[in-house]
């Protein structure tokens, strides 16, 4: 029997969301994504501790931030040995509201990859989908540095990223699901509120439809999944980035997977363009309590994990 994972690959490019690159060969993803939290998780494992220790040792006199950048590149280059496509490497979330420093950091990451023999076409620079992050992506894209816009929870963020010419966006599913489930509390009914009605699934479907309807070339990569049903409900999305745990569940399943998203259907939809000048962007994002709260929370969490990583580095000196 064909596995659910193999069926999904007929409609969608499968991406592995992990810093644990030893698991990649098993699932044969096209691309891989990382973030500070995933790298922090990986370096706490015995298998990856030597990478951290060597990076600290090789750059003993440098700042923790300098070492983190080299650590990200060390993981990225190892990942690229195991996949045919691209790896996403994230700009420090503490720069999420600083356009120029985000641009500088994106350029620096690409230079480090190129110095390691990796072409920029194999790297996506991850930036938070703040107004400032989107403006940074606009500049980097013009320089041939491709960007992956993360912490994306709303259509207005997606529309602004597309207008800026971002290579790819990563709209989150699971974190949207979490927010609405918490809001409903005891009234949440998984049978009624999950599946195709899952708010996170609906958000990605809405963004995908908007992009295909208006002919944007920016790729849509659904991210942050809690269940395999969230994944299979988005079969047909350009890409889906999936944790090793959920990749394993899809690999072990033979449940039928049908295409759910289609560019042809999207082109026939009746839609209006979203206003994405700065004041309209900020107002629409502010008007969406879920997106506002989850964007802020995501930046805080990624920033906190960057600080934890810095402390680990300092402890090894």
Curated annotation (Swiss-Prot):
SUPFAM superfamilies: Aldolase. Its EC number is 2.2.1.2. GO terms for biological process: carbohydrate metabolic process; pentose-phosphate shunt, non-oxidative branch. One of its GO terms (cellular component) is cytoplasm. PROSITE patterns: TRANSALDOLASE_1, TRANSALDOLASE_2. CDD domains: Transaldolase_TalAB. It comes from the Bacteria. GO terms for molecular function: transaldolase activity. Keywords: Cytoplasm, Pentose shunt, Schiff base, Transferase. The active site is at 126 (schiff-base intermediate with substrate). It catalyses: D-sedoheptulose 7-phosphate + D-glyceraldehyde 3-phosphate = D-erythrose 4-phosphate + beta-D-fructose 6-phosphate. It is found in: Cytoplasm. Disulfide bonds: none annotated. Pathway: Carbohydrate degradation; pentose phosphate pathway; D-glyceraldehyde 3-phosphate and beta-D-fructose 6-phosphate from D-ribose 5-phosphate and D-xylulose 5-phosphate (non-oxidative stage): step 2/3. Belongs to the transaldolase family. Type 1 subfamily. Homodimer. Transaldolase is important for the balance of metabolites in the pentose-phosphate pathway. HAMAP family: Transaldolase_1. This is Transaldolase. It comes from Burkholderia pseudomallei (strain 668).
């Amino acid at each position: 029997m064909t596995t659910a994972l193999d069926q999904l690959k007929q409609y969608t490019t499968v991406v592995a969301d992990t810093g644990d690159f030893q698991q990649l060969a098993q699932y044969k993803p096209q691309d891989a994504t990382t973030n500070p939290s995933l790298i922090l998780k990986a370096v706490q494992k015995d298998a990856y501790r030597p990478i951290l220790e060597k990076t600290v040792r090789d750059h003993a006199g440098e700042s923790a931030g300098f070492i983190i950048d080299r650590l990200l590149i060390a993981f990225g280059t190892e990942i690229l040995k195991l996949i045919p496509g691209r790896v996403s490497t994230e700009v420090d979330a503490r720069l999420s509201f600083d356009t120029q420093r985000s641009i500088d950091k994106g350029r620096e990451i690409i230079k480090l990859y190129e110095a390691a023999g990796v072409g920029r076409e194999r790297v996506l620079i991850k930036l938070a989908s703040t107004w400032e992050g989107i403006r940074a992506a606009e500049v980097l894209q013009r320089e041939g540095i491709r960007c992956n816009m993360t912490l994306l929870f709303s259509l207005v963020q997606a529309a602004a990223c597309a207008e800026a010419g971002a290579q790819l966006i990563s709209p989150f599913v699971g974190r949207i699901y979490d927010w609405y489930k918490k809001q409903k509390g005891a009234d949440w009914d998984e049978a009624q509120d999950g599946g195709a009605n899952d708010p996170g699934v609906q958000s990605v479907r809405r963004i995908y439809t908007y992009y295909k309807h208006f002919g944007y070339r920016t790729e849509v990569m659904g991210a942050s999944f809690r269940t395999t049903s969230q994944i299979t409900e988005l079969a047909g999305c350009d890409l889906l980035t999936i944790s090793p745990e959920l990749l394993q569940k899809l690999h072990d399943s033979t449940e039928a997977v049908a295409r759910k998203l289609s560019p042809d259907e999207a082109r026939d939809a009746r839609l209006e363009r979203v206003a994405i000048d700065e004041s309209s962007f900020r107002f629409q994002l502010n008007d969406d309590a879920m997106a506002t709260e989850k964007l802020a929370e995501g930046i805080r969490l990624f920033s906190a994990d960057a600080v934890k990583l810095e402390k680990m580095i300092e402890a090894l000196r």
